[in-house]
Design a protein with these regions (language model features):
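Acidic, Ala/Val/Gly-enriched low-complexity intrinsically disordered segments
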Residues: 5-8, 12-15
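Conserved NTP/Mg2+-binding pocket subregion across the NTase superfamily
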Residues: 91-198, 203-206, 217
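Glycine/small-residue-rich interface belts in oligomeric ring/scaffold proteins
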Residues: 74-98
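Generic structural signal for hydrophobic core residues of well-folded globular domains
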Residues: 72, 118, 203-206, 210, ...
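Structured mid-to-C-terminal alpha-helical surface segments
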Residues: 43, 153-170, 210, 214-286
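Helical scaffold of the NTase/Pol beta-like nucleotidyltransferase catalytic core
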Residues: 14, 18-50
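Active-site nucleotide-donor binding segment shared across nucleotidyl transfer reactions
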Residues: 35-83
């Protein structure tokens, strides 16, 4: 259970984030996209990393857009007032056009919103805790020290549900989303191989998480995922592999080392302490 660390890792000066050399340059590059997106609180971002296929190790040449994810701490007036800002989404492709390889997506969550999703076992939210290419603030380092608070067996139905959605997308039993289908992929390979890759990726992640309490990023089976994504497997083969992995995840859950449910009071304390310490630091640095 989290009991607070007296500000260790949180009360430090945030400007520059203590990064050096090329790490600082890469952080500045990512922050530039956040500013280009006209996010109103770039100095409140406590965690920022490149997600998507690059995070998982399944990127194929220059076919993917750039996905930037992050967490921010809102100013007190947004948290305590009437107008909140739980998340921020922006894309160079806008709301209608499908993304191309030159596009950039920025997805940011408030700390409270991210923690709420992570408590539910949301796969995207849990990736934030394991992103190896991340640039972090002292506040986020505190969360990494207590990441096990967010790792429970409640993640299993979330991962399996996301994987099933991708499987249905692959087989054509589910809508393709507001930005439309991927006709060029289906025409080339005969089915949606990107959805196939995501199906297997989610299942491998789920199995590892409930068995070992971690998610390795990039994925150890990234070469296999790339082969799936480039059409080296038939759809029937992918369905068979997915079926075996679904069963493996259920078996792993039955023997899981993870607790069955979230310690919500501990998470609430960690989140509340982080907000207070961040705001206090901002006051001190004025």
């Amino acid at each position: 259970m989290y009991r607070g660390e007296g500000g260790v890792g949180i009360g430090a000066e945030l400007e520059g984030w203590g990064l050096r050399g090329n790490l600082k340059k890469s952080m500045e590059d990512l922050l530039k996209y956040v500013r280009d997106a006209e996010f109103s609180y770039p100095h409140s971002v406590i965690h920022l990393f490149v997600g998507g296929s690059e995070l998982h190790g399944a990127k194929v040449n220059e076919t993917d857009d750039l996905d930037i994810y992050g967490v921010y701490i809102e100013p007190p007036e947004l948290v305590l007032g009437l107008e909140g800002l739980p998340h921020f989404v922006w894309s160079t492709a806008g709301n209608e056009r499908r993304n191309g390889p030159d596009d950039v997506d920025v997805t940011l969550y408030s700390l409270k919103k991210w923690a709420s999703l992570a408590c539910k076992g949301n796969p995207t939210a849990l990736h934030f805790l394991f992103s190896s290419n991340a640039q972090r603030s002292p506040v986020w380092e505190e969360f990494l020290r207590h990441k096990r608070l967010f790792l429970t067996q409640t993640c299993v139905p979330q991962f399996l549900g996301f994987a099933d959605d991708q499987l249905k997308r692959m087989t054509g039993r589910r809508g393709r989303g507001k930005k439309g289908q991927r006709p060029e992929i289906e025409e080339r390979y005969g089915y949606d191989v990107k959805a196939a890759m995501h199906t297997l990726r989610l299942l491998y992640e789920c199995q590892e998480l409930v068995t070992h309490g971690t998610i390795t990023l990039p994925r150890p089976e990234k070469d296999l995922l790339i082969r799936v994504r480039t059409g080296k497997f038939s759809m029937d083969r992918v369905i068979s592999m997915a079926s075996e992995l679904f069963d493996a995840c259920e078996r792993a859950k039955a023997q899981s080392i993870l607790p069955k449910k979230i310690d919500r009071p501990a998470v609430s304390k960690l989140v509340a302490d982080s907000y207070r310490m961040f705001w206090d630091t901002k006051k001190t640095n004025r």
